[in-house]
Curated annotation (Swiss-Prot):
<dbReference type="InterPro" id="IPR020040">
    <property type="entry name" value="Ribosomal_uL6_a/b-dom"/>
</dbReference>
<dbReference type="InterPro" id="IPR036789">
    <property type="entry name" value="Ribosomal_uL6-like_a/b-dom_sf"/>
</dbReference>
<feature type="transit peptide" description="Mitochondrion">
    <location>
        <begin position="1"/>
        <end position="32"/>
    </location>
</feature>
<dbReference type="GO" id="GO:0032543">
    <property type="term" value="P:mitochondrial translation"/>
</dbReference>
<keyword id="KW-0699">rRNA-binding</keyword>
<comment type="subunit">
    <text>Component of the mitochondrial large ribosomal subunit (mt-LSU). Mature yeast 74S mitochondrial ribosomes consist of a small (37S) and a large (54S) subunit. The 37S small subunit contains a 15S ribosomal RNA (15S mt-rRNA) and at least 32 different proteins. The 54S large subunit contains a 21S rRNA (21S mt-rRNA) and at least 45 different proteins.</text>
</comment>
<protein>
    <recommendedName>
        <fullName>Large ribosomal subunit protein uL6m</fullName>
    </recommendedName>
</protein>
<comment type="function">
    <text>Component of the mitochondrial ribosome (mitoribosome), a dedicated translation machinery responsible for the synthesis of mitochondrial genome-encoded proteins, including at least some of the essential transmembrane subunits of the mitochondrial respiratory chain. The mitoribosomes are attached to the mitochondrial inner membrane and translation products are cotranslationally integrated into the membrane.</text>
</comment>
<keyword id="KW-0694">RNA-binding</keyword>
<dbReference type="InterPro" id="IPR000702">
    <property type="entry name" value="Ribosomal_uL6-like"/>
</dbReference>
<dbReference type="GO" id="GO:0005762">
    <property type="term" value="C:mitochondrial large ribosomal subunit"/>
</dbReference>
<keyword id="KW-0496">Mitochondrion</keyword>
<keyword id="KW-0689">Ribosomal protein</keyword>
<dbReference type="GO" id="GO:0019843">
    <property type="term" value="F:rRNA binding"/>
</dbReference>
<dbReference type="Pfam" id="PF00347">
    <property type="entry name" value="Ribosomal_L6"/>
</dbReference>
<dbReference type="GO" id="GO:0003735">
    <property type="term" value="F:structural constituent of ribosome"/>
</dbReference>
<keyword id="KW-0809">Transit peptide</keyword>
Amino acid sequence: MFSIDSCLKTRPLTFRIARLGMNFTTCSAARSYVGKKEIIVPKNIQFDLEGEQLQITGPHGTLNMRFPNYLNLSKTNDILKVGMDANIEKQATKKQRAMWGTTRAILANNVKGVTMYWQSIIKLVGIGYRTSLNDGNIHLKIGYANDILVSIPTDVQVENPTPTSLVLRGIDRQKVTQFAAKIRSFKKPEPYKGKGIYVDGEKPQLKAKRSIS
């Protein structure tokens, strides 16, 4: 296992993996633009790369992600970069360039998650709509005959600051946003009165009622 932070800081550390048996085609250089963008990394973040598995550890926890072996990772002071060896980049396939940008985006999200959490805010809009927490579950009173009971995932934290709002937090952005979408699905905002469950500042998209003459 390699640890970036355990190595000398006098020069960039780069993990380079040999390229074997790849087929290459041309593609737009724009696909690699996102991949080349730098990531600002706090001092208390640790990276460990073993094979195609990259582990990111910070004050709020640890995340693991796939890191393709045709990419390399370098860190100088607080700057982290995802790159390709020059001879690979010249002939990289469209899929490889797309994965370069995707890998960089996921890595940036994971760094933010273990540093300061991802957050999603849920708001209930409707007369009598209420929500509460009990025994690891969210209770939703949203106009049905029975309350909706939603189990809280172990890797998502939930707060209930008001009777009509929830705050979701977690280190994994995808899990936080997926759970927010699940909660919203129980009462999607309706287009005439605006009742429903709203996520992250979502605004009502109201339709005008048609009059019958």
